[in-house]
Structure formats: C-alpha cells, structure tokens
Amino acid sequence: MALLVRVLRNQTSISQWVPVCSRLIPVSPTQGQGDRALSRTSQWPQMSQSRACGGSEQIPGIDIQLNRKYHTTRKLSTTKDSPQPVEEKVGAFTKIIEAMGFTGPLKYSKWKIKIAALRMYTSCVEKTDFEEFFLRCQMPDTFNSWFLITLLHVWMCLVRMKQEGRSGKYMCRIIVHFMWEDVQQRGRVMGVNPYILKKNMILMTNHFYAAILGYDEGILSDDHGLAAALWRTFFNRKCEDPRHLELLVEYVRKQIQYLDSMNGEDLLLTGEVSWRPLVEKNPQSILKPHSPTYNDEGL
C-alpha cells in the first residue's frame, strides 16, 4: 500500500511539469527529495520545448530569455557590381585533352592570340622607360636590372589577362614563352658563355616563379604587403630609401587599375598595352584608354 502511494505521488509530481510556450510551471516546494530529483531530470526536455515555441524560461529570482534573436548578414553586392573572371563552358572532350596538356578550342584563333601576346610582351620591353627606373629607383644599368623591370611589367600583364578565361590563360603562357626566348637571345647577343647562360636561365626561372607568387600575394593585400614583395624581389632586399618603395607601390597600383579599365577582347585581339609614367606630371590624367584600332590584314 505504501509503495502504491509513492508511485501515485511521483506521477502527480511529473504531471505538474506541463510545457507551455512561454514558461514552465514550477513544482511546489512541499514535495520530497525523490520528487525533486525526478522533477530536475525532467526539466531538460521541457526547456527544449519552450525554446522551440519561442518562449522564455521562468526561474524564481532569475529572468532568462531563451528566444534569442540571431544576427542575419545583409546581402552583399552581386557579381554584376564587380568584374569577375570569365567562366567558359567546356565539354568533356575539351577537359580531357587539356588534362593531358593540350589546348582545346578557344574563343578566338590561336594564331591571333599568339600575335597579340607577342605585341603585349613587346610593349613591356619597348614602351617601358628603363632609364627612368634606373634613375629614380637608383638601380644599376645591368642585364639583371632590365630583367627585374621587365618581369614586373610582364606580371602585371599576366594579372590582367588571367581574367579573360581560357583564352587569357593561353595568352599568358605565350607571353611567358616569348619572354624566355627574348632573355635567351639577349644573352647570346651579349656573348655570354652557353654553359653560364643555361645555368643563369635556371636561376632566373626560379626567381620568376618566386616573384610571381610574391607579387600575387602583395597585390591582394594592403600596401604593406605589396611593399614587402617589391622589397624582396624588385630591390633584392637592398632599398635604403623608403620613398623608392612608396613610388613603386603607387606605380603598381595605378598601373593595375589602368589595365583593368582596358577592354578584354581588345587585349586578346591586339595586345596593345600602354604604360603610365613612373611619376605622374598630372595625376588627373589617368583616364580610360581609347579603344585600339584593329588591323586584321597585318595579323
């Protein structure tokens, strides 16, 4: 009989915990130790139900709100607001042959892209004022200094053309190919020993890929990161005047912005690139470049 009375008391205490959306009804304090233990163990599922209903838990002396309002991030600007790399749809066959190291069909003719790449590299060499770099950056007039300046401008062209999809990436490979052909030819004209030239070509190749990684990291970071990349690569960690770094950081930033303003299709078909001066006489003169004139007969 006593056991039956205890069971009935326990059922009564449990039934008093009725979940309500706004709060939980507390148990009367006159219950025994066994009833309190059962009531404490039954609190967790009831609390989860009150959270699901969006209510709050009422505890004597403590007011805890369980229905928290979570922060929702506002929608950022769409991809239409900022230029994005061109994504081309390619078939399975194209993916297979490109995975094997071959180049699939492109948007434009490959021989036109090759000629445009040659023109773009030529603009890096012929349209750059090397004497101004030697003077303002206090660089010696040597073959290594010429290579560092050319490398910087070739990298800026690669950054721009990688935004033009598969055709732009193909053009980047051709630009780099023409650069190494030119470096090797200049070494032969200077009368460098073939063995020494081959050894130096390996060193310059390693320096080229290290510089590309450093410049890419610098252009994606702030001016401190870009200045560090230029100090390590362009100045070979030998720049005593910080104004030279400041000048070069400004030059790279404005030149990248200037190249981004050029039409991608025009660059793929003509390869015509113009460079801003190292020191601007009129800072307001940085305007959108004129569209180039096409000459299909000469292609």
From Swiss-Prot:
Keywords: Cytoplasmic vesicle, Membrane, Mitochondrion, Mitochondrion inner membrane. InterPro entries: Ubiq_cyt_c_chap, Ubiqinol_cyt_c_chaperone_CPB3. GO terms for cellular component: cytoplasmic vesicle; mitochondrial inner membrane; mitochondrion. It comes from the Eukaryota. Transmembrane segments: none annotated. One of its GO terms (biological process) is mitochondrial respiratory chain complex III assembly. It is found in: Mitochondrion inner membrane; Cytoplasmic vesicle. It holds the Pfam family Ubiq_cyt_C_chap. Belongs to the CBP3 family. PANTHER family: UBIQUINOL-CYTOCHROME C REDUCTASE COMPLEX ASSEMBLY FACTOR 1 FAMILY MEMBER, UBIQUINOL-CYTOCHROME-C REDUCTASE COMPLEX ASSEMBLY FACTOR 1. Interacts with UQCC2. Interacts with UQCC3. Forms a complex, named COMB/coordinator of mitochondrial CYTB biogenesis, composed of UQCC1, UQCC2, UQCC4, UQCC5 and UQCC6; stabilizes nascent cytochrome b/MT-CYB and promotes its membrane insertion. Forms a complex, named COMB/coordinator of mitochondrial CYTB biogenesis, composed of UQCC1, UQCC2, UQCC4, UQCC5 and UQCC6; stabilizes nascent cytochrome b/MT-CYB and promotes its membrane insertion. Forms a complex, named COMA, composed of UQCC1, UQCC2 and UQCC4; activates MT-CYB translation. Required for the assembly of the ubiquinol-cytochrome c reductase complex (mitochondrial respiratory chain complex III or cytochrome b-c1 complex). Involved in cytochrome b translation and/or stability. This is Ubiquinol-cytochrome c reductase complex assembly factor 1. It comes from Homo sapiens. The lineage of its organism: Eukaryota, Metazoa, Chordata, Craniata, Vertebrata.
